[in-house]
Swiss-Prot record:
The gene is pagP. Residues 1-24 form the signal peptide. Its EC number is 2.3.1.251. GO terms for cellular component: cell outer membrane. It comes from Pantoea ananatis (strain LMG 20103). This is Lipid A acyltransferase PagP.
Length: 190
């Protein structure tokens, strides 16, 4: 009886095993392809930039629905600072940038943030100088309240711009009284 059951189940189990192996190999290949695209874009942006960028932090806003009044009143929402970077537009018109900026964080302490940003860019008007974008940024930050240990971050990125002036923004997710911060800056391309 066991031999008959084993013989009956062996073909479907073997097919299932090979199916999972094939899916794992395909997933591994997709991850490698995505990583190769990412590193290629970073390298090309560094080696062949179209512009030099100046960054000026503009606003930090702590989401009022996720903070109590005590925290809101003691946090800094004017992140003065500056930064610089290089950027390019690819053949599809999408933006790629490498940057480093430093600004005053919620506790009014210096916070550096550097990384790579990508935005799919649209130019919906007849005036091609007007554009907006949606994408992501992947970078590293370090904060005073975390002992300035490097912390990686992948965040959403959005922008609206005209010509070489852009208003870029992100949202840092979090928990109650922590994170949930809208952060925006101006970026000029030269």
């Amino acid at each position: 009886m066991n031999r008959y059951l084993l013989t009956t189940l062996s073909a479907p189990l073997l097919a299932l095993f090979f199916s999972f192996s094939l899916q794992a190999a395909m997933l591994s290949q997709e991850i490698k392809s995505g990583w190769d695209t990412f590193t290629g874009n970073v390298q090309q942006t560094w080696q062949q930039p179209d512009a030099i960028d100046v960054y000026v932090p503009a606003i930090t806003w702590h989401n009022r629905w996720t903070y109590d009044e005590e925290h809101i009143h003691r946090y800094n929402e004017r992140p003065w600072g500056a930064g610089g970077g290089v950027s390019r537009y690819d053949e599809k018109g999408n933006w790629h940038g490498l940057y480093l900026m430093a600004f005053k964080d919620s506790f009014n302490k210096w916070e550096p943030f550097g990384g790579y940003g990508w935005e799919a860019t649209w130019r919906p008007l007849q005036d091609q100088n007007f554009h907006y974008g949606l994408g992501y940024t992947a970078g590293v930050t370090a904060r005073h309240n975390w002992g300035y240990y490097p912390v990686p971050a992948i965040l959403p990125l959005a922008s609206i711009g005209y010509g070489s002036l852009n208003f870029q923004m992100t949202y840092i997710p979090g928990t109650y009284n922590n994170g949930n911060v809208y952060f925006a800056w101006l970026r000029w391309q030269f």
